């Protein structure tokens, strides 16, 4: 996919197929998320339909997507380097820096010699430009032809049309320029260098863009890097003279549920399972496992026989044996990776508006280019024909729907990836976009704001003795303070009596609270706040929170809560540290700010540059116009700058 027009076309095609309930296509990640009925339509059917529409659909199970992307980037880089070689040679010949000594063989007349030398240089430039078009620019013409067959157009269509016009006009001038223009006293030129440089700059831009986009997906690669390739399988064959069993290094894909696996200190646990045996120098019957990448907890967790362990976590001290419980795509790590991938591939509401604009963008640019050509030609006559053609070509080249298409998804990919690194799992892009709007947060007390306390704590407040087995979670007070400093009103919901609820609210620094709360009361409060015009986030961890979670504008669940709550929630906090709440809001605000920055740049670029390429300043007597060559450089820069700007979120 070359631009947002492509992703919009693919999405539109998928949504039109019978059996597909919903489809979302991301330009930045080049992925499609499809909810479909396999009884009505198969993956092969989708593949065929997308192929008929002019695009290639790669089914992840067929072959390695990463390998395909690597191979495509290698080809892109090779064509870019070749295009630069053609561009340098073309510039040298067109500028007269290389003559191959042909002037020595020309006839003695100075004018005729100059004419023949120029004609020879033009012919060499023609061959170089043709080779560049056929090899380096092949993808643009193939894509443009496919789009034409389906009555659509994309960024490749603009590149193909502009370079073809420049090449054909230059070819005509090479053989007939003196006869047609020279005889009428009209100065003529060839523009092979422009057609070559357009392709060179566009390919260079795409190379830089792909490298930058690859950086936006670093969080996924980091998560995938937590999955080991092999596992140490405990066989049923005993070691001679001992009661222990032999072990065999096997690919992780061969592990079955129930298999016994040994993991030593520093190695990654390959699958989810239950510890059957553990030992370390500190504790003879336990090992210590680093779960920071999953739960965010900095202190290694002690694991004894009967405890659960998760794929991707690492025994920092000791070794353990475990029985495989969940394998492959069913592990917690695989679920996290899948959730992040789906979130990065989902679309924010603003992106759907941009996609609609992109569908009319290319036809609109083509119309502007035609109008530009006609105005120059009608005002200047035949003498202005070269200028009219160059102006139209510059308009076609400088227009950039790519920047518009990349503005939102690249920022979302980085933002969602950054959140995952902080143990904040975002289920869809709309949640990240909406989170910055919230001005009210409803939070459940038990299990969310507080955790069980093993010791009975007698607390005296206002001559009231409270016996409690709970304590505030670490940093709960600071988290509530930061939320309220951001203008978010916090409402605590508790099933406790008034006195206890008041105590916990005061201790956490929360001004609003409700006591003796029933499950329906949480939903009622969310509805009441929404009726008051507030954007409400709900944070909970239990089954009795699901109704309120489903109703809230943004729903958040604690990762150690129930699966039901996490399924309903749009955002899951894997850590018990409530500072993740203000951190999520802060990240949402920065991501949305970055999206609007990108969109502003993408639109303002087109609004300013298209008239400049058309020569609008000549109306005011200013002799300045962007040439096709520089138009291609600016177009490439606009796309790359949007992606690089999104990458600044990594520093947030």
Regions found by a protein language model. Give the residues of each.
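Flexible metal-binding regulatory segments at protein termini and peripheral loops
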Residues: 1-121, 237-245, 334, 338-346, ...
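Membrane-water interface of transmembrane alpha-helices in multipass transporters/channels
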Residues: 119-126, 154-158, 178-198, 353, ...
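Transmembrane helix-loop-helix hairpins at the membrane interface
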Residues: 75-230, 356, 626
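Conserved ATP-binding TGD loop and adjacent catalytic N/P-domain core of P-type ATPases
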Residues: 8, 29, 426, 436, ...
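Membrane-embedded alpha-helical bundles of multi-pass transporters
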Residues: 99-119, 149, 168, 418, ...
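Conserved catalytic phosphorylation-site environment of P-type ATPases
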Residues: 390, 400-465, 529, 548, ...
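Soluble-to-membrane junctions at the N-terminal ends of transmembrane alpha-helices
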Residues: 66-86, 123, 143-166, 337-369, ...
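Conserved cytosolic catalytic loops of P-type ATPases
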Residues: 17-40, 44, 189-192, 222-330, ...
């Amino acid at each position: 996919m070359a631009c947002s027009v492509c992703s919009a076309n693919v999405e539109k095609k998928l949504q039109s197929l019978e059996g597909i309930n919903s489809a979302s296509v991301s330009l930045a990640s080049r992925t499609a998320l499809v909810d479909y009925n396999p009884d009505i339509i198969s993956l092969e059917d989708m593949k065929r339909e997308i192929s008929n529409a002019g695009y290639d659909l790669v089914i992840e199970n067929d072959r390695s997507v990463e390998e395909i992307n690597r191979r495509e980037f290698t080809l892109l880089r090779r064509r870019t380097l070749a295009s630069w070689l053609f561009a340098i040679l073309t510039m040298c010949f067109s500028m007269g820096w290389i003559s191959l000594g042909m002037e020595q063989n020309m006839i003695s007349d100075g004018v005729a010699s100059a004419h023949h030398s120029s004609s020879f240089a033009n012919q060499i430039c023609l061959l170089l430009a043709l080779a560049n078009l056929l090899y380096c620019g092949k993808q643009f013409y193939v894509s443009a032809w496919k789009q034409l067959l389906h009555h659509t157009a994309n960024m490749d269509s603009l590149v193909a049309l502009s370079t073809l016009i420049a090449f054909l006009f230059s070819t005509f001038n090479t053989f007939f320029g003196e006869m047609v223009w020279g005889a009428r006293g009209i100065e003529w030129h060839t523009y092979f260098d422009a057609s070559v440089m357009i392709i060179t700059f566009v390919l260079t831009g795409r190379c830089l863009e792909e490298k930058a986009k690859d950086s936006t997906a670093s969080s996924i690669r980091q998560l995938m890097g937590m999955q080991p390739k092999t596992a140490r399988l405990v066989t049923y064959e005993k070691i001679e003279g001992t009661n222990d069993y032999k072990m065999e290094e096997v690919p992780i894909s061969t592990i079955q549920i129930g298999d016994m696996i040994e993991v030593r200190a520093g190695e990654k646990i390959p699958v989810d399972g239950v510890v059957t045996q553990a030992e370390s120098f500190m504790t003879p019957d336990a090992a210590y496992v680093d779960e920071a990448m999953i739960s965010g907890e900095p202190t290694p967790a002690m694991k004894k026989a009967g405890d659960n362990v998760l794929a991707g976590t690492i025994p920092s001290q000791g070794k353990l044996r475990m029985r495989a419980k969940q394998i492959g795509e069913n592990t917690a790590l695989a679920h996290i990776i899948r959730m992040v991938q789906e979130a990065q591939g989902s679309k924010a509401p603003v992106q759907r508006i941009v996609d609609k604009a992109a569908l009319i963008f290319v036809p609109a640019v083509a119309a502007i280019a035609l109008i530009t050509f006609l105005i120059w030609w009608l005002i200047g006559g035949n003498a202005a024909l070269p200028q009219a053609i160059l102006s139209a070509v510059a308009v076609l080249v400088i227009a950039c729907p790519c920047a518009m298409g990349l503005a939102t998804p690249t920022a979302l990919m980085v933002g969602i990836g950054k959140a995952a690194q902080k143990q904040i799992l975002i289920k869809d892009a709309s949640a990240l976009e909406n989170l910055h709007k919230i001005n009210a947060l409803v939070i459940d007390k038990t299990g969310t704001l507080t955790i069980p306390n093993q010791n009975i704590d007698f607390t005296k407040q206002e001559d009231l003795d409270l016996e409690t087995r709970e304590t505030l979670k670490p940093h709960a007070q600071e988290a509530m303070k930061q939320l309220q400093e951001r203008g978010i009103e916090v409402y605590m919901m508790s099933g406790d009596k008034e006195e206890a609820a008041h105590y916990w609210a005061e201790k956490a620094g929360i001004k609003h609270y409700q006591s003796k709360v029933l499950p329906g009361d949480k939903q009622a409060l969310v509805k009441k706040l929404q009726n008051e015009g507030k954007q409400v986030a709900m944070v909970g961890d239990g089954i009795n929170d699901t109704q309120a979670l489903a109703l809230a504008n943004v729903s958040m669940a604690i990762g150690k809560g129930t699966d039901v709550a996490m399924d309903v929630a749009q955002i899951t906090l894997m850590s018990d540290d409530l500072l993740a709440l203000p951190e999520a809001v802060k990240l949402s605000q920065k991501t949305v700010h970055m999206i609007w920055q990108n969109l502003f740049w993408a639109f303002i670029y087109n609004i300013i540059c298209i008239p400049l390429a058309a020569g609008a300043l000549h109306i005011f007597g200013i002799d300045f116009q962007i040439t096709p060559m520089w138009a291609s450089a600016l177009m490439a820069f606009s796309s790359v700058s949007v992606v690089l700007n999104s990458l600044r979120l990594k520093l947030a």
